[in-house]
From Swiss-Prot:
Plays a role in the inhibition of host innate immune system by acting as a negatively regulator of type I interferon production. Mechanistically, interacts with and prevents host IRF3 nuclear localization to inhibit its transcriptional activity. It comes from the Viruses. InterPro entries: DNA_clamp_sf. Induction: Expressed in the late phase of the viral replicative cycle. Keywords: Host-virus interaction, Inhibition of host innate immune response by virus, Inhibition of host IRF3 by virus, Inhibition of host RLR pathway by virus, Late protein, Viral immunoevasion. GO terms for biological process: symbiont-mediated suppression of host cytoplasmic pattern recognition receptor signaling pathway via inhibition of IRF3 activity. Gene3D superfamilies: 3.70.10.10. Interacts with host IRF3. The lineage of its organism: Viruses, Varidnaviria, Bamfordvirae, Nucleocytoviricota, Pokkesviricetes. SUPFAM superfamilies: DNA clamp (SSF55979). This is Uncharacterized protein E301R. Belongs to the asfivirus E301R family.
């Protein structure tokens, strides 16, 4: 059968020409003189995925911190056991400007509806906050194929800061992250399956590793009932690393319900998991310029 017959009648699909956007990073002054914040980025779907994650976690209000170098989103999940901190470094976007450090409060459900209408036809998002309209955040989406701009005016507020949530940022500082004794990577599918399967039998699971080049273990045991043991023998397959001394054992117990809800909410394929001695867990993932951190506290079990 010829290629023409296989293709069928009609014109071949038109190849989409994608503009080449330069990522200039941080600007010394805004493009628009009235701007307190300007953020221009050629990957709007990153924001859509971020707010899908907030929705999956049933987050309510979101704190937004703008600084001269980055924009950060803070929120909690419905259980209040997990804290979400998502940061975009201004140097990794098309252009970024913020005059100073300031906070905005936005309603997740309101912004989520806006992002639900955004598809792949929109190739750029621009976010603007102006001195003359401090109660409004402008979201501008651009479709270059038909030269269309869609602008949303979202009401924002000067929020009451959640200091316990903001304090969690110390857990993901560069210096602190160096000291986590155990870390590995799962795909979102692996994470979801492991904790979904475990939830059928137990509320707590033990994460354990001996010092040195040894496997990672996840297990539980119910006396006179059932036990289960999951072992990861090849450290390279899950990018397993640790700083545990050879003579020591790292062991923590975590509540499965917290991890299961996070696993079901994930919007990235790869998740890096970091463990502290006190049982706190950090789930890290990246989406282009966005670094997404979710901290689950063991003392909330």
């Amino acid at each position: 059968m010829s290629e023409d017959i296989r293709r069928g009648p009609g014109r071949p699909p038109k190849k989409r020409v994608v503009p080449n956007f330069e990522r200039k990073g941080i600007l010394e002054k805004p493009v628009r003189p009235q701007s307190r914040l300007e953020f221009s980025y050629d990957n709007p779907l990153i924001f859509k995925n971020l707010f899908i994650y907030f929705k999956n976690l049933k987050s309510k209000n979101i704190l937004v911190r703008c600084t001269p170098t980055e924009i950060t989103f803070f929120s909690r999940d419905q259980s209040q056991a997990s804290f979400v901190i998502a940061t975009i470094d201004g140097k990794n976007v098309n252009h970024y400007y913020a005059s100073d450090v300031f906070w905005l409060g936005i309603n997740r459900e309101l912004v989520e509806k806006m992002f639900n209408s955004i598809d792949r036809s929109f190739l750029k998002i621009t976010i603007v906050h102006r001195y003359d309209k401090p109660e409004t955040l402008f979201f501008i989406f651009t479709d270059f194929d038909i030269d269309k701009e869609c602008t949303y005016h979202i009401t924002v507020s000067e929020p009451e800061l959640d200091m316990d949530l903001i304090e969690m940022e110390k857990s993901i500082s560069e210096e602190r992250l160096k000291n986590y004794p155990l870390r590995w990577e799962f795909t979102s599918k692996q994470l979801k399956k492991t904790f979904s399967d475990l939830s059928n039998y137990t509320e707590l699971v033990t994460i354990e590793k001996l010092g040195g080049d040894t496997p990672l273990h996840l297990y539980f045991q119910k006396f006179n009932s059932i036990s289960y043991h999951e072992m990861y023998k090849s450290s390279n397959k899950i990018n397993l690393t640790s700083t545990i001394p050879k003579s020591q054992v790292f062991q923590i117990n975590v509540k499965i319900a917290h991890i299961k809800s996070l696993a079901s909410a994930m919007v990235t394929d790869k998740i890096r998991i970091l463990c502290e001695e006190n049982g706190n867990l950090i789930f890290q993932s990246e989406m282009d310029a966005l670094m997404l951190n979710t901290i689950t506290l063991n003392n909330m079990i």
